[in-house]
């Protein structure tokens, strides 16, 4: 096999490979001889089938197998010999001339093909011990825990029908019909809807107009949907709602005791407080870690500048772009609604894709140099967590993961990255800073540098007056 480098520009490589017809013939002769000893063909004794007869019957199919084996093995062997790592699976380019292909299969022509690929850039790990980050820490007060316990326990609160007017914290049962310009709109109606006044369950201005109503009262209220409302056809629009009050109920006293905790599946009130404190600590801890990680990534981004494999960047950009367009479509919005243009958005997300790829390569190199590994136990736990997300489909998901190495690799990657971040945290300068929970959870304008850019399509909301909590999705690097 003759290997010749025909392109070496930056990270791009092109390798021409020529397998002489004589080499192919030698491999075919060896395969025919092996087959001759096993062949069972009518008219011939076992092991005595003439090679020429076997060649006539199986020559082309055997040669096709040989060619495929060469293609499968060549990338790995050539990269190993050149001491290179390909960023993606090398692209194989062969002649599309059918006559030429027939000559190769007939053993009358050399097998010629090219490998096109990009190499992973050589990265020299720099001294990261000088990186300094600030870790924000929140002291969790007993009052905050008790407040959260009350919110959780309020789901067990009972209500008692009353005859008077509805007040704040009362529960009203209503029928409502929403209209735009006098016409009902989809998703804007419900019967026997229960609403605790003051809970903020419905859009602003809705609940306040129900205060003072009694069972049997009917009223038409006017509200304006928030400008950022997820359903684009309702955002910023004024709507009316025909309201019929069917019941007003006052809340009974909320008792916080062991019995209340048991209704929530917790053995005691003390244990409930402990669980709530742990949940708050975990929530704040995740935010803190994200902020610290962002500082680390920003520091690394400033320290490492090198050419990135364009195919990796293209793949990352395509993933981002697909998600962005899906978000916009779901929300019924356009780039203009997001105060940008498609061209500007493409440029912005392209930069984000390049940053992610570059930082991913840096973290990978740091982890490799530090001997960071994902254990089988950690990977199995990730597989279990993934399978558990699909109740009723556990077997199908498990089988899919078992036969799809790339899917398992996608589970391994974030574990590896988190362990590399842990390694960095143990070797850089970390200063703890006490902050309030408001400071910790404040919107970070720079978050786009490691997550999605600030201009982002909002999640679609149901076209009803109920507010839906949006869950933020942070994507690393």
Swiss-Prot record:
Main location: cytoplasm
Pfam family name, one: Trigger_N
One GO BP annotation of this record: chaperone-mediated protein folding
Annotated region (Disordered), positions in chain: 435-477
Enzyme class per UniProt: isomerase
Compositional bias ranges of the Basic and acidic residues kind: 467-477
Matches recorded under InterPro entries: PPIase_dom_sf, PPIase_FKBP_dom, Trig_fac, Trigger_fac_C, Trigger_fac_C_sf, Trigger_fac_ribosome-bd_bac, Trigger_fac_ribosome-bd_sf, Trigger_fact/SurA_dom_sf
Domain PPIase FKBP-type: 169-254
EC number: 5.2.1.8
Biased composition (Basic residues): 454-466
Molecular function GO terms recorded: peptidyl-prolyl cis-trans isomerase activity; protein folding chaperone; ribosome binding
Domain of life from the UniProt record: Bacteria
Catalyzed chemical reaction(s): [protein]-peptidylproline (omega=180) = [protein]-peptidylproline (omega=0)
Subcellular location: Cytoplasm
This protein's record includes keyword Cell cycle: yes
CC per GO annotation: cytoplasm
Domains as described in the record: Consists of 3 domains; the N-terminus binds the ribosome, the middle domain has PPIase activity, while the C-terminus has intrinsic chaperone activity on its own.
UniProt function note: Involved in protein export. Acts as a chaperone by maintaining the newly synthesized protein in an open conformation. Functions as a peptidyl-prolyl cis-trans isomerase.
Family in the record: Belongs to the FKBP-type PPIase family. Tig subfamily.
Protein name: Trigger factor
Organism: Brucella ovis (strain ATCC 25840 / 63/290 / NCTC 10512)
């Amino acid at each position: 096999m003759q290997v010749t480098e025909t392109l070496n520009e930056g990270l791009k490589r092109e390798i021409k490979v020529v397998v002489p017809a004589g080499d192919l013939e030698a491999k075919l002769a060896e395969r025919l001889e092996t087959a001759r000893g096993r062949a069972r063909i009518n008219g011939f004794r076992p092991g005595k089938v003439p090679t020429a007869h076997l060649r006539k019957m199986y020559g082309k199919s055997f040669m096709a197998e040989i060619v495929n084996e060469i293609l499968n093995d060549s990338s790995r062997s050539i990269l190993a010999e050149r001491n290179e790592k390909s960023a993606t699976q090398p692209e194989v380019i062969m002649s599309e001339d059918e006559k030429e292909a027939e000559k190769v299969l007939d053993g009358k022509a050399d097998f010629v093909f090219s490998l096109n690929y990009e190499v992973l850039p050589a990265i020299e790990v720099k001294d990261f011990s000088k990186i300094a980050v600030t870790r924000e820490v929140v002291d969790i007060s007993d009052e905050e825990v008790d407040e959260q316990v009350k919110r959780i326990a309020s789901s067990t609160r009972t209500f008692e029908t009353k005859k008077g007017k509805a007040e704040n914290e009362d529960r009203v049962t209503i029928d409502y019909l929403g209209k735009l310009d006098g016409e009902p709109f989809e998703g804007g109606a419900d019967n026997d809807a229960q609403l605790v006044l003051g809970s903020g369950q419905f859009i602003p201005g809705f609940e306040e107009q129900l205060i003072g109503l009694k069972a049997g009262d009917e009223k038409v209220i006017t509200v304006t949907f928030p400008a950022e409302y997820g359903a684009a056809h309702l955002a910023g629009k004024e709507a009316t709602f025909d309201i019929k009050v069917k019941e007003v109920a006052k809340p009974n006293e909320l008792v916080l005791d062991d019995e209340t905790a048991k209704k929530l599946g917790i053995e005691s009130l003390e244990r409930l407080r402990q669980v709530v404190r742990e949940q708050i600590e975990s929530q704040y801890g995740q935010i803190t870690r994200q902020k610290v990680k962002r500082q680390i990534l920003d520091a690394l981004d400033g320290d490492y500048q090198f050419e990135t494999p364009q195919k990796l960047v293209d793949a990352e950009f395509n993933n981002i772009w697909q998600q962005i367009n899906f978000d916009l479509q779901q929300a019924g919005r356009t780039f203009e609604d997001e105060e940008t243009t498609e061209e500007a958005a493409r440029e912005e997300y392209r930069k984000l894709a390049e940053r992610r790829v570059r930082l991913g390569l840096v973290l990978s190199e740091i982890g490799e140099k530090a001997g960071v590994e994902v254990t089988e136990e950690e990977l199995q736990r990730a597989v279990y967590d993934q399978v558990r997300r699909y109740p009723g489909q556990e077997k199908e998901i498990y089988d899919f993961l078992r036969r799809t190495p790339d899917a398992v690799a996608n589970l391994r990657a974030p574990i590896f990255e988190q362990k590399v971040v842990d390694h960095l945290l143990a070797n850089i300068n970390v200063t703890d800073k006490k902050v309030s929970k408001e400071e910790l959870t404040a919107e970070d304008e720079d978050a786009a540098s490691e997550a999605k850019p600030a201009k982002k399509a909002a999640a679609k909301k149901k076209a009803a007056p109920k507010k839906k909590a949006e869950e933020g999705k942070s994507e690393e690097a």
